[in-house]
């Protein structure tokens, strides 16, 4: 793994965070391949979480990008009461580890923290995520996002824009 690749992947993930914080949903969704998987599993116990979304519960599971597109549609049209009003968010990505997979895809493992404020309630979600990225001519596309939420309590709504 080269320093140039690490830098490019890090910048891509920082841009993803910025797009989400700025509610730039079209550009945000465009970062995902059409058939990209998005998964936030639930915990089974203190040290094990659901590995297969078809065999256990998940906080969020989208088999492909259409799940994110549907969620954004509901937010934009006011049909998502849990997201009205949207929270202000600040996504932080750190401890980025990058490696090239045998099939030419890129794996990026990160730690993340999202601070949010909605209707006077401030909070923080944090965890780890693994991305599988497909290199493009000038950037990357997300093939898979697997985020593990480390919070024990969810005192508010948990949605894709919190992760």
UniProtKB/Swiss-Prot annotation:
Domain of life: Bacteria
Pathway: Aromatic compound metabolism; anthranilate degradation via hydroxylation; catechol from anthranilate: step 1/1
GO biological process, alphabetically ordered: 3-phenylpropionate catabolic process
Similarity section: Belongs to the bacterial ring-hydroxylating dioxygenase beta subunit family.
Role summary: Component of anthranilate dioxygenase multicomponent enzyme system which catalyzes the incorporation of both atoms of molecular oxygen into anthranilate to form catechol.
EC number: 1.14.12.1
MF GO annotations: anthranilate 1,2-dioxygenase (deaminating, decarboxylating) activity
Cysteines paired by S-S bonds: none
Subunit structure: The anthranilate dioxygenase (AntDO) multicomponent enzyme system is composed of an oxygenase component and a NADH:acceptor reductase component (AntC). The oxygenase component is a heterohexamer of 3 large (AntA) and 3 small (AntB) subunits.
Catalytic activity: anthranilate + NADH + O2 + 3 H(+) = catechol + NH4(+) + CO2 + NAD(+); anthranilate + NADPH + O2 + 3 H(+) = catechol + NH4(+) + CO2 + NADP(+)
One Pfam family here: Ring_hydroxyl_B
SUPFAM superfamilies listed in its UniProt record: NTF2-like (SSF54427)
Protein name: Anthranilate 1,2-dioxygenase small subunit
Activity response to pH changes: Optimum pH is 6.3 for the reverse reaction.
Keywords, comma-separated and alphabetical: Aromatic hydrocarbons catabolism, Dioxygenase, NAD, Oxidoreductase
Alphabetized InterPro entries for the sequence: Anthranilate_1-2-diOase_ssu, NTF2-like_dom_sf, Rng_hydr_dOase-bsu
CDD domains xref list: ring_hydroxylating_dioxygenases_beta (cd00667)
């Amino acid at each position: 793994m080269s320093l140039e690749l690490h830098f490019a992947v890090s910048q891509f993930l920082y841009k993803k965070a910025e797009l989400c914080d700025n509610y730039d949903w079209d550009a945000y969704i465009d970062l995902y391949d059409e058939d990209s998987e998005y998964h936030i599993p639930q915990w089974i116990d203190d040290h094990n979480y659901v590995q297969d979304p078809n065999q256990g519960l998940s906080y969020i599971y989208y088999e492909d990008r259409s799940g994110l597109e549907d969620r954004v549609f509901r937010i934009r049209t006011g049909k998502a009461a849990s997201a009205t009003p949207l929270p202000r968010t600040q996504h932080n990505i750190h401890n980025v580890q990058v490696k090239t997979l045998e099939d030419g895809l890129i794996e990026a493992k990160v730690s993340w923290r999202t601070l949010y404020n909605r209707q006077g309630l401030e909070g923080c979600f944090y965890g780890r995520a693994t991305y599988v990225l497909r290199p493009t001519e000038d950037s990357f596309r997300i093939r898979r996002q697997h985020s593990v939420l480390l919070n024990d309590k969810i005192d508010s709504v948990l949605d894709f824009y919190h992760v």
